[in-house]
Amino acid sequence: MAAAVAAWPWALFCLAAVPPLLSPGAAGLSCCYHAKDNLMCRDVCEQILSSKSDSRLKHLLQRAPEYCPESMGEVWGCINSSLPGVLKKSDGWVGLGCCELAIAVECRQACKQASSKNDILKVCRKEYENALFSCINRNEMGSICCSYAGHHTNCREYCQAIFRTDSSPGPSQIKAVENYCASISPQLIHCVNNYTQSYPMRNPTDSLYCCDRAEDYACQTACKRILMSMKTELEIVDGLIEGCKTMPLPQDPLWQCFLESSRSVHPGVTVHPPPSTGLDGAKLHCCSKANSSTCRELCTKLYSTSWGSSQSWQEFDRFCEYNAVEVSMLTCLADVREPCQLGCRNLSYCTNFNNRPTELFRSCNSQSDQGAMNDMKLWEKGSIKMPFINIPVLDINKCQPEMWKAIACSLQIKPCHSKSRGSIICKSDCVEILKKCGDHNKFPEGHTAESICELLSPTDDLENCIPLDTYLSPSSLGNIVEDVTHPCNPNPCAANQLCEVNRKGCQSGELCLPYLCVPGCKLGEASDFIVRQGTLIQVPSSAGDVGCYKICTCGHTGLLENCVEMHCVDLQKSCIVGGQKKSHGTSFNIDCNVCSCFAGNLICSTRQCLTEHSSEDERQKFTGLPCNCVDQFVPVCGQNGRTYPSACIARCVGLQDNQFEFGSCISKDPCNPNPCSKNQRCIPKKQVCLTSFGKFECSQHECVPRQLNCDQTQDPVCDTDSVEYSNVCTLYQKGKNLAYRGPCQPFCKSVEPVCGHNGETYSSVCAAYSDRVAVDYYGHCQAVGVLSDYGFHTECAFVKCPQLSATGCKPVIAPGACCPLCAGMLRILYDKDKLDNFARVTNKKPITVLDILEKLRLHVSVPQCDVFGYLSIESEIVILIIPVDQKPKPLQIEACNKEAEKIESLINSDSPTLASHVPLSALIASQVQVSFSISSPSVKVGPVLHCLFISFSFTLLKLMDYI
């Protein structure tokens, strides 16, 4: 036991293979009696012996020496005998505590079985396992230094604290070592000083030797100039990207050298352990979309747990990167590397791409602009070099130079279609330019202009390719583009931050920027994909198994934490519909309903349909409402928090009679009778739940502690007297009633009820917006709105619709609404089982419509548009992306349309841009409808409407900002 105890300081015990559930029994717990005089040790002992989780047990064992000193041999001897096989001596291998930092699985296993660093050198490659070797070096140094402490416990503990973390030791830590160890061991002080003195910031010129690794002479020169003139890491990285005309790649010798020098030269430099998400969890998500097993395996190898060899990268480039049949995987990878963003401006070479605020581009920046000019210079030499073919061309300065410039700029700036997100030029343009300007005598044997273009641009479908004539002339908008702005494009934030549109406004006296830089996490050590801190993220299993995912939290350390494995989904399962096989992920229509096959399960909307085969009797009974319910508005409130127009419709969507009650949900008082305890206050919190309310209670209130003193949290709310408070606590402390969340608005002082698109009557426009519900018309809800393409509902004829917000707009009518509006509209199918699983493995709370809206809102990049939505009575989530100005310009309406089309495409393609986020990954199919501009100055609406719709208070940007 003495030998075992001596190993404690460096976490030299580890979990062996043991059954996951241990039952210590009374004999085991009696071990802790030996620690009766040390309550902290006794508590840890009891936690160890009662732990039912391997990971929890491992954590406790690593922390135990801090509470149970080595002198308590009886405790450790008893634990060893009570949990045989759990504690294993590691014979002095100080690197054991670092093994979890290994990226490659085989390296991690070798580390756990090793007895010295030499044992892992053949398996673990230093160039890839920087974090592991840095940790081992630190522990080796710590083992030597702290051994001088002998049996002096305090000195040893303060010494160990210096080496326990991979961050720089603070002055107080160093001072503590001096105080406790100076009189005990001068050698220890000298050893620690040698270690801590390596921490001052490195001089950038120390890395000048890396510049010689650059393959391009211009890059070598720029690198040396930058390292000798710039000081901060951010300046240096940005300068190198601009000077070398390349983005950082881990396989690039220059960047590889910088990584090695910054991480492993000093043993204490900060190196975060890689998360259990593979090297790039976002790109790993794309691998399952590969059409061929070869590309799927290569993709998985490159982005899972260890860097692929240079041969793997070359093979992926050769067989997959430009393969037209792999368009689904390649588009997905492009979404991760360079997501499509609205707007392009400030280019000096590709000037025809400027001033296009409502078009999508992947790479509108100065580097790509310069890259296009460089490409043109290379092509002037008479050859266009592609990875799989060289294309000989005539003098491009004389033969269609503007067309060639448009091609070079398109390849670099990468315009992308709002629906397909494709960035390739159209085949007809490719054939035309090669027929005119290709050097046919030098074409590769057997190739023609058509065959070459079949490899490069195999389609003329305008939803999947970019026509070049768009960029042969400047934008028709000129410089008048201020109607639509893009605060996050180009990205103003640091590399570890996420840029978000500032919709909250600013406190008085604050510098108010149109964007917010929020801390985030990367989805893997080699990932540039940033997610918001505090959010739940879905990532593929790090092994890359298709259909296997885990849910993680983006923690405050900037790393993904608390990962929980989900049940694997069989993506090979198909659905049989009408005798036809439908593959996973396929969306299609059955009559008027949109359906999707998800892992063998058929998920459809519940629209009532008329078909060409419908009988005369069916046509006469047809109402357009679910189950052909009668067009009567007698609202009932379901236990999911949704108001349904009638009991018939509630039953049709699956509610039992005991699962709804008459009256709208908003009219119910969830705090009467009071469901909270005496020391708590009941606060109404209306929500519409998407999860099964039988599994996760859809409560309409929250119980909060009664506080004498409220904190200073700024989360403005407005009471029923139009008085504003800093937060809900302050409002209730004053004995007031909540009217709506968000700052008080002058126009809401005179309370006038409005009907939301969800069929709920709100006390004011502000109250509706606080639920992120847009307004259909003024007054109490009185009708079931339009649902069917086959006709209209007579009750809407009695509704007075406001004036339309813009002329020249062909409006949309949201399902269940009466009045038209200028907006982009999405009707989305979701997987309820998946949402239930998310709720089960996370916080056991229901997932709501508001959860979806708040997440989608972050993906709308134009501040002139905002997101509203509701659950329709046809089992779809309806999303409305609406201009916020009272009289929106055509450009703003178009921007909202493009945002809607972009989100539809991301949902339908299962792009990691959305699918990485919980709960957005449960959105499986979407249909978009946009209110495009028409030439006529006025809009004629159907006879039932006779009226036009105003966007009510979409001028109220301040209100939008807080809601």
Swiss-Prot record:
One of its GO terms (cellular component) is Wnt signalosome. Residues 31-332 are annotated as: 5 X Knot repeats. Keywords: Cell membrane, Disulfide bond, Glycoprotein, GPI-anchor, Lipoprotein, Membrane, Protease inhibitor, Repeat, Serine protease inhibitor, Signal, Wnt signaling pathway. Disulfide bonds join C627-C652, C629-C648, C637-C665, C710-C729, C718-C744, C755-C781. InterPro entries: CC4_RECK (IPR056978), EGF1_RECK (IPR056976), EGF2_RECK_dom (IPR055134), FnI_RECK (IPR056977), FZ_RECK (IPR056979), Kazal_dom (IPR002350), Kazal_dom_sf (IPR036058), RECK (IPR039016). A lipid is attached at S936 (GPI-anchor amidated serine). The record marks D631, Q632, Q712, T713, K749, S750 as: Reactive bond. Residues 621-667, 692-746, 749-783 form the Kazal-like domain. Glycans are attached at N80, N194, N291, N346. The keyword Signal applies. GO terms for biological process: blood vessel maturation; canonical Wnt signaling pathway; extracellular matrix organization; negative regulation of metalloendopeptidase activity; regulation of angiogenesis; regulation of canonical Wnt signaling pathway; regulation of establishment of blood-brain barrier; sprouting angiogenesis. One of its GO terms (molecular function) is coreceptor activity. Residues 1-28 form the signal peptide. Knot repeats lie at residues 31-78, 98-135, 145-191, 210-257, 286-332. Residues 937-963 form a propeptide. It is found in: Cell membrane. Functions together with ADGRA2 to enable brain endothelial cells to selectively respond to Wnt7 signals (WNT7A or WNT7B). Plays a key role in Wnt7-specific responses: required for central nervous system (CNS) angiogenesis and blood-brain barrier regulation. Acts as a Wnt7-specific coactivator of canonical Wnt signaling by decoding Wnt ligands: acts by interacting specifically with the disordered linker region of Wnt7, thereby conferring ligand selectivity for Wnt7. ADGRA2 is then required to deliver RECK-bound Wnt7 to frizzled by assembling a higher-order RECK-ADGRA2-Fzd-LRP5-LRP6 complex. The Kazal-like domains mediate the serine protease inhibitor activity. Belongs to the RECK family. Interacts (via knot repeats) with WNT7A (via disordered linker region); the interaction is direct. Interacts (via knot repeats) with WNT7B (via disordered linker region); the interaction is direct. Interacts with ADGRA2; the interaction is direct. This is Reversion-inducing cysteine-rich protein with Kazal motifs. It comes from Gallus gallus (Chicken).
